[in-house]
Each structure stands twice: as C-alpha cells, then as structure tokens.
C-alpha cells in the first residue's frame, strides 16, 4: 500500500518474493525525475513500523535498468536491474545505481571468487597473519592480532574484498571460526616452546555472535588447544553494537565474558555507536582507529580526539590500543597521552605465525617479554 501510494497512477509495482519488488516506471523524463520518484518511494518505505513493541525503520536500495538502452526483453531488463541492485547493496549506502555494462563483468568475477572462497574454506586453505602489539610504557611485547589471509590464483586477495564477500554470501561464520582456530593453534605452539605470547585478538562478526552456540564453540576451541580464556580477546566493531538484535549480541558477549574471554571495541570513533554502548556492553579495551593516529603530530583535531578517547577509556576502567602507529613521533604523542598499547608498522607488519613465533624468541632474548606468565 505504501509503494502504490508513493508511485504515479500509471506506474506498476510487483512483489518478486521476500523483500524484493519490481517497478515498471513509464515516461520518466530524465535521471533527475527518476531520483525524485525513487526518493519518494524510499521515504514511504522508511516510515517506522511497530513490531512487538519495538519501532523498526525499514531501509531500501534500488537497481535501475533503462529501456531500450539496457535491454528490450523483460527478462534482460530485470536481470540488469538486479545486477545494479547488487552494486547498490555492495556500497552499503542505500540509494540507487543505474545499470552499467561493466557491472556484469564485476558480478561474474565476484561469483567466481565466491566459489573459490567456498572451496578453499572447505579445504582449509586460508591462512592467518599475526601483527604484534607493544606495551608503550616499556616496549614489552603485549600480544598479537590475528588477521585472515587468502591467496587465490597465485596472488593475495585484499582482506576487505574477501571479508565483505564472505559476509554477503553467508561464509563469514566458517571464515571466522577458521581464523579463531588457527589463532589458538598458533598460540598453543608458542606456549609449547615456553614463550609468553601474552594473548591474541581475533575479529568476530555480528553473524557469529548471533549464533546461539557461538560461546560454546569458543569454549570448545579453547579447551581443544589448551589455551586459557584470558589469553583470547574478541574484537568487535561499533556497527556490531548497532545490530538489529542487540539483545542477542549482548547475551553472547556476556557468555564469552563468563568464560573469561576479553572483549575489545575496534575502530572506536568511526561508527555511530553512542557512549551509552560502553556502559551497556562488556568491553575491556578500546582500539583507536588508524584514521585518528595518522595525523596526530600535525592535526590538532585528531590529537584532541585521541587524547579524549584515552581519557574517556581510562575513566571507565578500559585499556586503550592505538592502531596504525608508524612513526616515533606518533609513539611519543601516545606515550605522553597515557595510551597503553600500540600496534602498527613501527613495531611490525602482519606476518605468518612461524615468523611471529621467531619474533617472540628474539623478544625473549632481548628481555622484552613480560615476566608474568599469561
């Protein structure tokens, strides 16, 4: 009813299934007129809906194919509009995209890449890299972050590309579990050598946290590898806290905390989460996003924001990690600001687990491993 009310009298709307609809919009003068029409439809869709005592605000995305430029047969036009819709959703900004010929090749590449990712996940061919973290006060080793890595066709696939692909195709859960298992195995290898890796951080997606059995899976993996729960840190982004089912996210995080696992909030300051989330959710550490660190020596705003985050976190009893630290000047600023831990190319790039283990041997020889057992 909302869609029909927003459209013109001669426009046609058909439900394709689920939450997808097709529109036939005759006699649209130009793209300006099209944009106005789609904005009117989007506004109608986004009117709040009361569901189970909660107010839901629906969002919308559009893909557009133009007759006869993008095809003359109905099936071709529908397919090309669907391709444009996929591109709109991939942008994560809503709105609309007009079909372009290059989109078809991009979709075909993405489909092939998705098939290869699924096969490599099943064959356990993905790997991890470990990036060291350093205690700012004394330069001691402070742990690692585990990062997913994938080589396809003899070349590395950029992590943002294949992680987003995994999210779009429902493979983020097995990908996340694979990374977690490899991270704990690497930690176990270091412990078996008598090294003190301190701990390891692993990124976790909302889809994983919403699985009822996720905390139990984490507990089973910790037990299998003989790793103390306190050595594992789960990293989540601010957007995870804004999920449509925050209650389930909260319960999962509480269960992980009950196991003794630590929780870090990644990319702090770049999302839309409010400060109330720091009170509601069981967080141990904040990670200052690299975008604030990059110019802290020259940009007074970035410097002020970074100092404020450190002060806020410490007032709440939270530790702070600065990401993307690349220069001695940045490190000096963070030290003066009271930041606890640093991570970035100044201390080491992400490296294979074996090389990370060798790094720990060198740190032990230099007296840069903490004395307390972790």
Question: Where are these predicted regions, by residue range?
Answer:
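Bacterial c-di-GMP phosphodiesterase EAL domain
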Residues: 101-227, 239-241, 255, 268-270, ...
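Conserved helix-loop-beta segment at the catalytic/binding core of cyclic-nucleotide signaling proteins
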Residues: 1-31, 54, 261-265, 318, ...
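EAL-family c-di-GMP phosphodiesterase catalytic domain
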Residues: 25-29, 68-70, 136, 140, ...
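HATPase_c (GHKL) ATP-binding subdomain of two-component histidine kinases
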Residues: 23, 58-60, 148
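Heptad-repeat coiled-coil signal-transmission/dimerization helices
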Residues: 3, 34, 38, 78, ...
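Cyclic nucleotide signaling catalytic output domains
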Residues: 13, 40, 44-50, 54-55, ...
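Nucleotide second-messenger and two-component phosphorelay signaling modules
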Residues: 1-12, 49-54, 91, 123, ...
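Alpha-helical scaffold elements within enzyme catalytic domains, especially in hydrolases
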Residues: 40, 87, 189, 255, ...
């Amino acid at each position: 009813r909302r869609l029909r009310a927003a459209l013109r009298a001669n426009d046609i709307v058909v439900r394709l299934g689920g939450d997808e609809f097709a529109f036939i919009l005759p006699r649209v003068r130009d793209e300006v007129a099209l944009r106005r029409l789609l904005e009117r439809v989007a506004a109608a869709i986004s009117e709040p809906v009361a569901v189970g005592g909660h107010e839901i605000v629906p969002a919308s995305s559009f893909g557009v194919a133009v007759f006869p430029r993008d095809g003359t047969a109905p099936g071709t036009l529908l397919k090309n509009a669907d391709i444009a819709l996929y591109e709109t959703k991939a942008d994560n900004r809503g709105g609309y995209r007009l079909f372009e010929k290059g989109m078809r090749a991009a979709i075909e590449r993405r489909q092939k890449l998705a098939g290869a990712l699924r096969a490599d996940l099943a064959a356990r061919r993905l790997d991890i890299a470990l990036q060291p973290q350093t205690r700012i006060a004394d330069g001691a080793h402070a742990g690692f972050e585990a990062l997913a890595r994938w080589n396809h066709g003899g070349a590395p696939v950029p992590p943002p590309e294949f992680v987003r692909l995994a999210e779009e195709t429902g493979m983020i859960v097995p990908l996340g579990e694979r990374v977690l298992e490899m991270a704990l195995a690497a930690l176990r290898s270091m412990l078996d050598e008598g090294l003190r890796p301190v701990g390891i951080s692993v990124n976790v997606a909302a889809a994983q946290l919403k699985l009822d059995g996720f905390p139990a899976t984490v507990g089973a993996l910790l037990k299998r590898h003989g790793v103390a729960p306190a050595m594992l840190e789960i990293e989540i982004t601010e957007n995870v806290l804004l999920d449509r089912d925050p209650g389930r996210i909260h319960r999962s995080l509480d269960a992980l905390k009950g196991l003794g696992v630590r929780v870090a909030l990644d990319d702090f300051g770049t999302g839309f989460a409010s400060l109330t989330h720091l009170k509601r959710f069981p967080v141990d550490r904040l990670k200052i996003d690299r975008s604030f660190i990059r110019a802290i020596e020259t940009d007074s705003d970035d410097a002020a924001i970074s100092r404020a985050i450190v002060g806020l976190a410490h007032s709440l009893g939270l530790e702070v990690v600065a990401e993307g630290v690349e220069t001695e000047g940045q490190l000096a600023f963070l030290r003066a600001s009271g930041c606890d831990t640093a991570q970035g190319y100044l201390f080491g790039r992400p490296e294979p687990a074996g090389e990370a283990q060798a790094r720990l041997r060198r740190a032990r020889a230099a007296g840069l491993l903490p004395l307390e057992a972790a």
